[in-house]
Amino acid sequence: MKTKKPKIVCITGGKGGTGKTLCAVNIAIMFKNEGYNVLLIDGDVENPNTYLLLNGKLENKIEVPFFMPQILEDRCSKCGLCSQNCASHALLYIDDSIPILMSSLCSGCKLCYKICPENAINPDFKTIGWTYSTEISDLSLLIGELKPSEARSAGIVEKLIENLENDLQKEPNKFDIIIFDTAPGAHCDVELLIDKSDIVIPITEPTRFGKLDLGRIIELINLLKKDYKVIVNRSSLLGYKDQFLAELQEENIKVLGDIPMDSDIVDSYCIGKPLMDKENGFNNNGAGFIAFTHIYENLKKWLEFN
């Protein structure tokens, strides 16, 4: 079942623990159930766990290299040009001395390597993380993981996007739909994935903190000029659903659907079997199952899928 080109849906949210991965995995599964070719990309590189909800394993591990300048002391003229032009101040230069690299500040931009008049900088690299690719239950997964102690998470996300673009260049019609599962927050990792998406689905919850963080992610989405609709997860929490939905309506925030508390969702999460996978035998009349089905139908209409 093919569409003209793959639609890219970004599942995101302003805070951790709202159910982004839960929604991303189950939405991917529902498209898979209907014969669509689906790619799920886990862009929460500091805590990738989509594969856990699918009871799968990380496979096909590939290192992600990151540029680091190596200064050749025998060639360096001690001019200080590299330090003067380093935007992240990663090269410490004291008059008539060899610049000292502070690797934790280096952005990997390679400017120092390109402008050195003495060719005294060699390109060196360190591993900042890994990518994985696997197939689980006819679902394609691309996963990024940041190496512990490393801070350049955006470098892993950029590598995921690069891998995606290379795949689409080779096989433009390989996938019908691509789903991003982002990190929580409204930082550069999230911005990179939202910018590559056709539509965005922020996940929130009916609490004051949920509302506050939803506002932050919507501000970023609007800045990037993307269309979005919200999913309210745990909508029956604290009996605040009606008031919360009314507040969203007052602010002209469109809602794709809401998901109430349901023990089947908890069970599926714990055993690593998605609620909406037709082979897992969960109750089709359960509150969570019905809610996800409603969200899926609304999403297909939004995407103009037949």
Question: At which residue positions do the language-model features occur?
Answer:
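Walker A (P-loop) phosphate-binding motif
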Residues: K2-K32
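C-terminal lobe/tail of nucleotide-utilizing enzymes
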Residues: K2, L220-N306
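Iron-sulfur cluster-binding cysteine motifs and their immediate structural context
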Residues: L81-L101, L111-K126
